[in-house]
Amino acid sequence: SAALIDIPIPGPITNTSLQLKSFSQSPVDKSFPPEELFALGSYYYPEQWDSSQWERDLKKMSEMGIKFTHFAEFAWAMMEPEEGKYDFEWLDRAVSLAEKYGLKVIMCTPTPTPPAWLSKKYPDILIQRDNGVSIQHGRRQHASWSSDRYRRYVENIVSCLAMRYGNHPAVIGWQIDNEPGHYGVVDYSENAQLKFRVWLQKKYGTIDKLNDTWGTSFWSETYQDFDQVRLPSQQEVPDKPNPHAMLDLNRFMADELAGFVNMQADILRRHIHKDQWITTNLIPVFNPVDPVRIDHTDFLTYTRYLVTGHNQGIGSQGFRMG
């Protein structure tokens, strides 16, 4: 489930990784006047409730002092129930009701939850664990960032959303995906294997350079061609994988995530009003997350859960507010 509140990360901040690159996006007050920096918002999922309840709920939210709401991040199956057949009338009504009661809307792209027909028709879009098991439809974040086919379907649905709501007066901004990160699961699908080899070739240029950097003369690991390289996996080797390969794996994953988010930001920019901002909400403990690489949004946000997250490795109170 999504968090109650997204808090913009003030910028610029300095990247603390070894990369000689700074993190700099638009100042937060460019999109939010100072008096609105701590506005209270809430996600609302109209697709989960009988439509007769929507007006009651949104009216009560407004009366409670909530200023904005998020829509649509998990609703791809409602928007495109069949391939190429779109239904936005229900979302039009939800946006109109929010506007009626003075609630601003953050529109979200529904890319963490592709519809069942898509993975049924094209199982090659699914991510795969290192034991060879593909992650199936039924929850979320099961489609591969490395799948060109999946990205084409993402482009279609994001373009449709942007063209429909990119100039709506109630829509103040856009959230790309939701907590992108595959829960830290590494994708070992054939799409990811191929993209990893391309990434390595672009980084190192020659296989000799890769061998030298990875220290592959140890244990006769030396490669003669990039096609021989696979994503490092504990399942495929009797001992721990090459640590240099693991480092490149993490960097590759971060680039794939960033490329997926940046691609959507570019699509949105082509259609939305210049006053509508673009963000995504991150979970920092997911391995692929590197905010430095996500640089096509206006700012980044960090999901904080009010009473959970104590077991996520960032301190006993790491996810709590205050």
Summary of predicted features, one role per range:
Residues 1-3:
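N-terminal export leaders
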Residues 56-62, 70-134, 162, 264-272:
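Aromatic-lined substrate-binding rim segments of carbohydrate-active enzymes
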Residues 132-299, 303-315:
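Polysaccharide-binding and catalytic clefts of secreted carbohydrate-active enzymes
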Residues 7-70, 81, 96-100, 104:
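N-terminal carbohydrate-binding accessory modules
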Residues 38-42, 69-71, 105-108, 172-176, ...:
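Hydrophobic faces of well-ordered beta-strands that scaffold small-molecule active sites
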Residues 46-47, 72-75, 108-117, 172-181, ...:
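Short, solvent-exposed turn/loop segments enriched in Gly/Ser/Thr/Pro and often Arg
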Residues 23-28, 52-59, 90-93, 161, ...:
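Alpha-helical scaffolding within the catalytic cores
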Residues 50-54, 85-89, 152-156:
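Glycine-rich anion/phosphate-binding loops
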